[in-house]
Amino acid sequence: VDLQFKGPFIWLQRLVEVMSLQQQGCIIQISSATAKIMLDNHAAYMGTKAGIDHVIRTVANEFGEKGIRANTISPGLTDTPMTADALQSPALANAFAQCYPLGRYGTSDDIAAAALFLASEDCFMTGENLQVNGGLNLRRNPRAHELEEAMIKAGEIPAPE
């Protein structure tokens, strides 16, 4: 909770102080599709991301008149160092990819492109949560037992006795 909510909250407080003096700014916070979509065994993570989404909306509302825009980006599963272990399992990678209408999970380039748009002068958005997750929010994440079954079927882990 300290890393996922308290740290960003304190950072946002300081950032808004500086941007208020400058009468401009653009805040882009990374959230997660799990703020809205369930993922087994991730309650604290999901809750902190939902909390950050709400804090960003509050910042956008309270500081918009000072020229500050604030938005979040919500990736789904994205090929990054944080997910590297999970994606090494072909069964897990495939189980997650099947949940995405676009047929794949995201890349850091997908997230960077969204951030560039949000940071651009052409962006007339504030207080928004940009879902950059290949349509995952139209479906759902696989359940823990479904992931386990996929790994057993692929021979990656033994079946329980």
Where are these regions (language model features)?
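Active-site helix of classical SDR
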Residues: 12, 48
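Alpha-helical segment proximal to the catalytic Tyr-Lys
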Residues: 17, 61-62
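Residue(s) in the substrate-gating loop at a strand-loop-helix junction
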Residues: 32
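Short C-terminal tail/terminal secondary-structure segment
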Residues: 37, 116, 126-161
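Active-site loop immediately N-terminal to the catalytic Tyr-X3-Lys motif
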Residues: 37-43, 65-66, 103
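Conserved Rossmann-fold SDR core element
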Residues: 53, 63-78, 125-132
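C-terminal substrate-recognition "lid" of short-chain dehydrogenase/reductases
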Residues: 69, 104-132, 137
